[in-house]
Amino acid sequence: MEEKYSGDIILISRMIEYFPQKSFEWNANEPITLDDVQFAINHHLSEMAIPFGDTFKYPPKKRTSQWHIRRILYFVNHPQEIKNIELDNESSTFDILPVPIIIDGYHRWMAARYLYELGSLHKIHCLYAGREDVLDYLKGKLDTMPQEEIA
């Protein structure tokens, strides 16, 4: 019997090499930064436990920036829930590129990034559907970032 895939543990520092920005934009021209998250914590903004939606199962509704910050705060306050971030690889017309992309889990990623900056979180759980060499790099098994495209 084949074992069901339950995900992988990857290094946040390796993900940051691909995603160095400290912000994400759910709403056009309204980026949410790690500084916004810190401001919300300092001002005791309440967290949001209700999920945003799944891009495949449930169409996400338009939410305010404050709602997204509150959702990030939920994961900051409950880091054990930072799991199942869905990753794949970027692709071009004919090639699979050695670049991971986040399919689902941006609130979790922003919380993980925030906690990493504090020095309190270094690894996260993901569901990875991409190239094995890129996964090995993200896990810390390879020292060199893959560069070659695969046809």
Predicted regions and their residues:
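Residue-level detector of alpha-helical secondary structure
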Residues: 16, 38-41, 73, 139-142, ...
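Short amphipathic alpha-helical segments that mediate assembly, nucleic-acid/protein binding
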Residues: 8, 12, 34-37, 69, ...
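Short alpha-helix boundary/capping and kink motifs at helix termini
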Residues: 37-101, 113-114
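Short intrinsically disordered terminal tails
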Residues: 1, 148-151
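N-terminal extension/subdomain marker
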Residues: 1-32
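A short, basic-hydrophobic beta/loop patch
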Residues: 82-149
